[in-house]
Amino acid sequence: MQSFREQSSYHGNQQSYPQEVHSSSRIEEFSPRQAQMFQNFGGAGGGSSGTGSSSSGRRGTAAAAAAMASETSGHQGYQGFRKEAGDFYYMAGNKDTVAAGTPQPPQRRPSGPVQSYGPPQGSSFGNQYASEGHVSQFQAQHSALGGVSHYQQDYTGPFSPGSAQYQQQASSQQQQQQQQQQQQQQQQQQQQVQQLRQQLYQSHQPLPQTTGQPASGSSHLQPMQRPSTLPSSAGYQLRVGQFGQHYQSSASSSSSSSFPSPQRFSQSGQSYDGSYSVNAGSQYEGHNVGSNAQAYGTQSNYSYQPQSMKNFEQAKIPPGNQQGQQQQQQQPQPQQQQPQQQQQQQQQQQHPPQHVMQYTNAATKMPLQSQVGQYNQPEVPVRSPMQFHQNFSPISNPSPAASVVQSPSCSSTPSPLMQSGENLQCGQGNVPMSSRNRILQLMPQLSPTPSMMPSPNSHAAGFKGFGLEGVPEKRLTDPGLSSLSALSSQVANLPNTVQHMLLSDALTPQKKTSKRPSSSSKKADSCTNSEGSSQPEEQLKSPMAESLDGGCSSSSEDQGERVRQLSGQSTSSDTTYKCGASEKAGSSPTQGAQNEAPRLSTSPATRDEAASPGAKDTSLSSEGNTKVNEKTVGVIVSREAMTGRVEKSGGQDKGSQEDDPAASQRPPSNSGVKEISHTSLPQPDPPGGGSKGNKNGDNNSSNHNGEGNGPSSHSAVGPSFTGRTEPSKSPGSLRYSYKESFGSAVPRNVSGYPQYPSGQEKGDFGSHGERKGRNEKFPSLLQEVLQGYHHHPDRRYPRSAQEHQGMASGLEGTARPNILVSQTNELASRGLLNKSIGSLLENPHWGPWERKSSSTAPEMKQINLSDYPIPRKFEIEPPSSAHEPGGSLSERRSVICDISPLRQIVRDPGAHSLGHMGTDARIGRNERLNPSLSQSVILPGGLVSMETKLKSQSGQIKEEDFEQSKSQASFNKKSGDHCHPTSIKHETYRGNASPGAAAHDSISDYGPQDSRSTPMRRVPGRVGSRETMRGRSSSQYHDFAEKLKMSPGRSRGPGGDPHHMNPHMTFSERANRSSLHAPFSPNSESLASAYHTNTRAHAYGDPNTGLNSQLHYKRQMYQQQQEEYKDWASSSAQGVIAAAQHRQEGPRKSPRQQQFLDRVRSPLKNDKDGMMYGPPVGTYHDPSTQEAGRCLMSSDGLPAKSMELKHSSQKLQESCWDLSRQTSPAKSSGPPGMSNQKRYGPPHEPDGHGLAESAQSSKPSNVMLRLPGQEDHSSQNPLIMRRRVRSFISPIPSKRQSQDVKNSNADDKGRLLHPSKEGADKAYNSYSHLSHSQDIKSIPKRDSSKDLPNPDNRNCPAVTLTSPAKTKILPPRKGRGLKLEAIVQKITSPNIRRSASANSAEAGGDTVTLDDILSLKSGPPEGGTVATQEAEMEKRKCEVVSDLVSVTNQESNVEKPLPGPSEEWRGSGDDKVKTEAHVETASTGKEPSGTMTSTASQKPGGNQGRPDGSLGGAAPLIFPDSKNVAPVGILAPEANPKAEEKENDTVMISPKQESFPPKGYFPSGKKKGRPIGSVNKQKKQQQQPPPPPQPPQMPEGSADGEPKPKKQRQRRERRKPGAQPRKRKTKQAVPIVEPQEPEIKLKYATQPLDKTDAKNKSFFPYIHVVNKCELGAVCTIINAEEEEQTKLVRSRKGQRSLTPPPSSTESKVLPASSFMLQGPVVTESSVMGHLVCCLCGKWASYRNMGDLFGPFYPQDYAATLPKNPPPKRSSEMQSKVKVRHKSASNGSKTDTEEEEEQQQQKEQRSLAAHPRFKRRHRSEDCGGGPRSLSRGLPCKKAATEGSSEKTVSDTKPSVPTTSEGGPELELQIPELPLDSNEFWVHEGCILWANGIYLVCGRLYGLQEALEIAREMKCSHCQEAGATLGCYNKGCSFRYHYPCAIDADCLLHEENFSVRCPKHKPPLPCPLPPLQNKTAKGSLSTEQSERG
């Protein structure tokens, strides 16, 4: 939610915040309106509301999913929530936006936060739009509500574009259609559909499009100008740059940006309308098409394209100011626009006519795009239901929103996609026509608005030129924003996932650079693909669309491949290649200028048309129609040839251009051209577009050439961003691109390793470009894959193409949509997550990264598949190898072997030569080692998802995809390392085998990871952390990708190491992604506490977008499974296949695996060292073999170990595994394990995100290798193992086959779970990779038993993994206090449940993580109390996660220490469960099982070790690894395999159990763990005294203990040997006991203790309620164990033998005076009065006197009152009063209160023991504490308002008289219904009043005292009611108790005597004042004693 907030803030920045400000009323206003609208539109909120809901659902899909479903309640509820959360977030984040003077941002912002932007937006859409007039609505809503509307759309887009939006589009399509019909009655029915979508996305847009096109344009301009107006917001826009940027753009380019975001998301999958929106967004760079963008954005395309165009163009429209701001805004917008674009795409898909109209209205270009969008839109309407359903289902998941968007895009598009293949985006409905039309439209638009429509090219150019050149400072200020805008546009139109990835990538690495690289990449791609410039750009921008259809392939490829196509094929190829290569090489600034210059300049025509007019036409027509053919061919050629060329020119150019981008491009060598590219694409794209064009450009650069786009982009980014994004570009792009694009670009840059000096740039640009690259790459790859698949260019990467195409063609309708849905959802989720987290983390960075992650991931998925390997290969230098995978995905399978070996070899050089560039080394290694990895590295976020999806769809591709998924996950993790939270989260989903999950993972990875890492990488990453983070993250990620990819590939191929790393990488990247998810859910948890609750819900919604995707992805998965069940098994088991390959290769290439492990470990170790992949690569190469390998295996260890144990148990892997285990713990203990978390965390801890980033940056690689090694071990190992095993079932040994069988179950689940695992991994990585490791472990277990979904879901909420995950988490919640999660879960549970089943693994991993997180958060206190099994499981988790939490908290404390810990804790426990499941599941792969066990053990140990600290944590982590290493490795792989076999068998059961019961999370999975957990508990309890890690191990053992005899023994052995190693390793890092204890304390120490001695060891404050006849319920607050004991004694003795309060002075005889009884609080009374003390007339907490105690009624009167537990109610009332008066209380001194409480406890005599006193004390504790009465406890609420007549008068007179803020307090004295006979007293007043005693709950003497007091006039205040008289005889001074204190009377507490100032003892006089105060204190105590 923070991401939401921040995203909201960003979005809200422009439009949402003012709307937020105005929106609060407006939202409230909207509430009814939205209620109306929602009611009217059935949840669409009338489109406006629906959009709001959609946006809000998108954004708050997790939280708002259910609300989204009922938009009315959701929006209204969310309006309140938005108002709170959204307004909160927006207010907090968007105060500048409000300052910026855009009311829209607030609204958007409101819609942004939860569904915050939804309601305003929805309201804006429906009612506000309606009320404001549709045109006016668009304008007004653009202006006023448009921001919200945009935010809705944007947030919907960015957050869960598909989620809420799709939910709305599901219901809202109808509702929105209703609303839009209402609006569209003004517009058209076609527009209605589109407007439905658009209204959903940009309800105001459709109308303005029809009625208010100009108005919409004005609105857009208005918002655009708003962004201009938002210079202050520009800073905010930087944050917004993450998400708010397009929201800011939404403010100025509200509709365009905001709407485009949803539309982009919708369009992303839809057609590249959204992509064009992205293209427009990219063109947003060239947003010279500002009016185009506005018109574009205003129209339906304005919905998606306007956002894009408007985003980008609008950003361009205000070329200098506005554009920069718009771009800034629009960058976030693109981020959100991605979701929005999805929505827009959906809108487009839904409203193709509207799009046409919109486009027509908006601009020719817009209409063209609109038509394209419309063409898609028509398909979208057809797919709309699917989209909506998928979206709707995932709408619960924010992810589903994006996924849905993608799903619709993919789903609908894939139908069209399958129909058109190319028109995924372009031709979702109209593949060739749509694509072409869009392309043509865009081209015409480009032509008509060359400067505007150069948007694709000029968009890139304009965006770059505008944003970067035109508004270079703004661009630079908001590189992420403009990049986000451009990137977002691109990314949004890239599959949303790609967009998310791209945005995440672009944004996180560099808000601007990221965005720019994304835009640039897309633009450069588009630009490079001039024809693909408009459409390709849109497609480029819509990797989703690109991914979504063959056209998607074309589109996706349009970005990456289209650049390649343009570059490598026909004009597109030539242009792109020239542009790409030239630009990349910077050799062709003319072409670069043509492409980039148009991009840069407002010569879209020049660049678009000049650079790609022919290419555009060719590519457009080609890619529109021929795109599939030509593009495929072009893709193949472009990608292959271009990849080859790019590899060459990319290797050279990229080497030089990456060098150039890093060096030359960074310098403004291609400043103009490259600046454009740099601005738009180069920021994310120099790495992602430029770098993606260069790296991803190499990925895309195969298409893009990464050169024209990439190099150009990169160059542009480099040059333009040279100054500002040079670090960004290189770090961002390199970071992201390094991850994804940097896998391509940075790896290219790594190719020019010296350019990894770009390492800094890479760090920034890697993230950035990688995000962009991811975006591009994924779509490029996806596009390529899809297109290649459609057009057999899939031969280029048969698997990629096959995967993507298999998905595209086989499942394009469903699978492709699923992929895209998953991507879109991921994009949305990731975008949301990214936005949320990106915003949170680095608002611009996060969002864009997330989006980039999402977008780039999908794009990367496709681009990665083909492009990436090539680009990666480029970096890897075996371009042919990389090219091979790119060349053929099938080959990619082989390539995994071929490329992996090559990569490994290259990786060796990469590791060494790139060693200095941690990122490059890793990426290079990854690329080199794994072209697949390269792809994967770029793919990680998007590719994984797409790959996963494609994987799912195409067995070959699946395997490859999974590999890529893994690699992508790895890379995403690396990217995610950049932006852990989102990135990893998204990457979790992206990395998830499941397309949706994978996409989401990628999104998460890119978003959160990149976002987080990017900030960190940007900051520390760029500095040292950037290199470290980047090197670590990017490199790690790349390395992981390499390893993962290499692991399978290299395993297949020469590399045992890559093999080793590959599984690890895949799982690790998943874990990292999940960790990132969880961390973005660190961020996600902090950030996504809201966001994590929402964003994580979204992020985990990504897996659950994977759930949506699940829906889709389920469909896809299942469809893929059915269609390509083998493929699905491969896909789902692609990780398993990869793992199998890895294992296969591991045994075959065990030495190489070892080598790879060495290499991988080296990077990992380097990462461990803070640059696991950095320079230490070489350093740790040898140690890394052990430690990095261990770390790898530790993080990735279980997966890798599982895999490697599978064949390293067979071979070296086990030693590697052991090493990895040990190293993982070592990493954990040392920098590696925990260093990734801690090192990354600590090194990146400077960066709040850095920590998460660092945890994820380092962890993605290291934790990925290490913590993921634990989580990844678990999850990835078993899951990836299973997947890989499954993928490589044939090559895998029989046990692997056995696992494969399980993989079929588990892989489906595993795949589903894997996303969630990856989500968990992301969450975990984000939080702590360890947690994710655990999560992954849990996920494997959950794989089988939904444990995964639960933890994952838990992770989701806690970690912002995903609402769906959250939802899943809820059931497994185990009373974690995951109320929000529960709520969100309930809201999103249906979809999530469904998704849980389908994506149970996907969601499961996240769930586990969330559970872990939440368990950690709330679980430790709660969990212990929770079910024993749960507690046990959570104990294990707690212990494990405690370590993780300790470490994560220590390290990832920044963003998600708690969530991380919770997640980690949960992940730990769940991981254990997962480990059980995984170990069991991995039983086939005993090694994985062992790995799982090791991981689980490792996690318990390592987690606990980690909590010790990086070192301590590492040691335990290593220890768990050691556990496995010792038990498994040391004991023997044999024992481990045996245990694993048992585990596997158990896991087999577990997978089925866990997999099938989505909610079985722990019931089945955790029951496994639990029943085992019970034993584990026992063991834990037994072993708990030793180290909690052991208990976690025990749980593991227990988990594994299903085959408990051996497993438990082994685990015990592991635990014990593990404990020994753990101790030993912990000793390495920290003594295990220490980690455990901190762990226990930190994580859930009490949970395990809770079972046995939780209360003894872990004390939870609680309220002790005793029912007493007279007193009613006596509630005692026990805040401390001492209190508990004392109160137990008191309660027993004191309550029973309550002596009169005046025990000191009076006898124990009951007073003869009448008594009062405490009665029920009067809630309804004709008498209203102030609640004041009846004795002193002062209110509660007056002068810190504490709470008022009461109400006391005369005994006669009390008898007439109903007998309730008055004490409790009164306590509540008191609490209320206390709360009310807390602020009023002058000095709430907690210390005093504590002292008083202590004194009270000391001095509490019988009174203290008295229940009433206790109640008073409790209320005082509760209320008094806050008030912190000076005499805190003396306050009794005894003021009888009615009976003490003077009370009211006293109150009023005394209030004024009280100098201590009496008047203030008086003002705050609540007017409450008071009974005339009720008395409230301060404790002090009663204590000090004569003759008042509290005996047995009866207050004696109060009436008499009151009667007397009424006659007594206070000498101090002259008011009646004095109760204290001077002790001196004859002295007539009488005081109220407070007055006595004020009068400096000496209050002697021993006998409660008062001495007036005159009669104070001379000496005591000084003392008495002191004593007065002391006496006050002691008096308070005494008084409290007296009661």
Swiss-Prot record:
Residues 1606-1627 have a biased composition (Basic residues). GO terms for cellular component: nucleus. There is a cross-link at residues 316, 739, 762, 777, 852, 861, 873, 949, 951, 958, 985, 1043, 1114, 1126, 1165, 1201, 1206, 1211, 1238, 1259, 1295, 1302, 1337, 1366, 1417, 1437, 1456, 1474, 1538, 1552, 1641 (Glycyl lysine isopeptide (Lys-Gly) (interchain with G-Cter in SUMO2)). Residues 1-79, 96-432, 446-481, 502-816, 844-891, 949-1065, 1136-1372, 1415-1434, 1446-1636, 1685-1710, 1760-1865, 1966-1987 are annotated as: Disordered. Keywords: Acetylation, Activator, DNA-binding, Isopeptide bond, Metal-binding, Methylation, Nucleus, Phosphoprotein, Transcription, Transcription regulation, Ubl conjugation, Zinc, Zinc-finger. It is found in: Nucleus. A zinc finger (C2HC pre-PHD-type) spans 1856-1892. Residues 1-22, 121-142, 206-235, 289-311, 357-377, 417-432, 526-537, 566-576, 585-605, 618-627, 666-682, 722-731, 1481-1501, 1850-1859, 1971-1987 have a biased composition (Polar residues). There is a cross-link at K958 (Glycyl lysine isopeptide (Lys-Gly) (interchain with G-Cter in SUMO1)). A zinc finger (PHD-type) spans 1912-1960. GO terms for biological process: positive regulation of transcription by RNA polymerase II. Pfam families: zf-HC5HC2H. Residues 1565-1579 bind DNA. The modification N6-acetyllysine is found at K631. The atypical PHD domain functions as a negative modulator of cofactor binding. Homodimer. Interacts with RNF4 and JUN. Binds to the regulatory region of MMP3. Transcriptional activator that binds to the regulatory region of MMP3 and thereby controls stromelysin expression. It stimulates the activity of various transcriptional activators such as JUN, SP1, PAX6 and ETS1, suggesting a function as a coactivator. This is Transcription factor 20. It comes from Mus musculus (Mouse).
